[in-house]
Amino acid sequence: MVKVIASSVRKGNVLDVDGKLYVVLTAQNFHPGKGTPVTQVDMRRIVDGTKVSERWRTTEQVERAFVEDLNFQFLYEDGEGFHFMNPENYDQVVVDVETMGDQKAYLQEGMTCVLSIHEGNPLAVELPRHVTLEIVETEPVVKGQTASSSYKPAILSNGIRTMVPPHIDAGIRVVIATEDNSYVERAKN
């Protein structure tokens, strides 16, 4: 276990709080006008999946568990969960639906993800920062809307809704940020 200050805690970190392991879902630092800066952390207990919210002073020490981050390739999904393979030694790991969370919509066959492994168990999955998806449905362009930088709603091939610039139509491939479902750019290929 390594002691770190609360302000350095990030999404995906594994913390040891009172002898129990938690995966950090979100971590935000708040600096109020008056008072001490604090770090608000939402976590999921690894053993039973219970969600917990903690608030620490940014300078407070918390224990980070030793977790190995390894590259794994996504193979397929079945009733058991999401199957990943380590390309170096061909070991396969199954990640359950709860651990995968909402990220499952972005998984594509052959995609390389970073799995956080603690004592042989997958704790968290980190997707690539950007994925390329196709626009399935979007509103048509309205002439004269080019003066403002307005975005229009669009539905991606994985079913997620996002906002895209007016010049993007259905059938076009775009790059999307996996962290917040936002449009990054039009795909190059």
Curated annotation (Swiss-Prot):
General function of this protein: Involved in peptide bond synthesis. Stimulates efficient translation and peptide-bond synthesis on native or reconstituted 70S ribosomes in vitro. Probably functions indirectly by altering the affinity of the ribosome for aminoacyl-tRNA, thus increasing their reactivity as acceptors for peptidyl transferase.
The protein's name: Elongation factor P
GO terms, molecular function: translation elongation factor activity
One Gene Ontology cellular component: cytoplasm
Coiled-coil region: none
Keywords: Cytoplasm, Elongation factor, Protein biosynthesis
Family per similarity comment: Belongs to the elongation factor P family.
Taxon lineage: Bacteria, Pseudomonadati, Pseudomonadota, Alphaproteobacteria, Hyphomicrobiales
UniProt cross-references to PROSITE patterns, sorted A to Z: EFP (PS01275)
Pathway where this protein functions: Protein biosynthesis; polypeptide chain elongation
SMART domains named in the record: EFP (SM01185), Elong-fact-P_C (SM00841)
Compartments in which it is found: Cytoplasm
GO biological process annotation, one example: peptide biosynthetic process
Organism (species): Agrobacterium fabrum (strain C58 / ATCC 33970)
Superkingdom to which the source organism belongs: Bacteria
PANTHER family: ELONGATION FACTOR P (PTHR30053), TRANSLATION ELONGATION FACTOR KOW-LIKE DOMAIN-CONTAINING PROTEIN (PTHR30053:SF14)
